[in-house]
């Protein structure tokens, strides 16, 4: 019924644990709040069920300036995510003060393929690392009405690479021809 959101300090970083019913706007909301609080994302583990009840489990290693978030900030982030999911907190309005949401990402590459191991449609999104990148990617995914059910993240030499395993609208598998169109559409949405 209600989202489970916990933030714990682990060594020099904070770890956010999240569980809820998966919906296409979820990651947009979560990453929007993290961007609004100026948090850095170091790693992302995401597992989503592909059958009812379609729950998603997320573990994010995050920090503020490379350090553990103060307890008060962690509590505010937790509350903000909860309020955003309930529609009581407009994350876009808060972000518009911090970022130019219309400016694109630099050197965007997108590629669609069907993963032979997971047998799921996958989308590779790569761009130069910059604040708000995750939010912009997840916002574009939401605009396309896609559901992320697994994700891999790699940050290397100033580039961020996300591999997102997806279901299409109505939790359907995405055929190749449509996936290629989606990849192209995402690239346009995200580029300068």
Language model regions located:
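Regulatory modules associated with amino-acid/nitrogen control
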Residues: 1-192
